[in-house]
């Protein structure tokens, strides 16, 4: 199965991706676009700019179009659309609906990690709290609203519980999809 994990920074996405790959035989992790771009020498601004998020969006779209099976993606295009929306950009101006649909339709499950009081207590404080909160709100609006009609049939699992045990919840959800 192809699983995408989305959420604002500091919500435990990478940890969940690693746990899922340990739990699911044959699944491989795909690093988030930020790390891949850094490895290629991209220099990000501090704080990040819209162009930084556009670069990550392009990489994320490309990664999802790869034919690999049994992968867990650390971030999806919706993450970067949410960051761009938090920067005041309209998602319709950032990506063509058919390009987004092509990428998102390659997923079997989208897992979303929203900010919750519990994760705020249990996880370390993240940088740029204002951007983090703004992105979280935009992400949930985009995921549930699907304004470009790009993932009408994609199952979405929103994990609002504690970080411990998230991978098992995802595995149970996957079993129900097979």
Outline where the language-model segments fall:
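A glycine- and Lys/Arg-enriched "phosphate-lid" helix/loop adjacent to the NTP-binding pocket
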Residues: 87-161
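Conserved lysine of the Walker
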Residues: 13
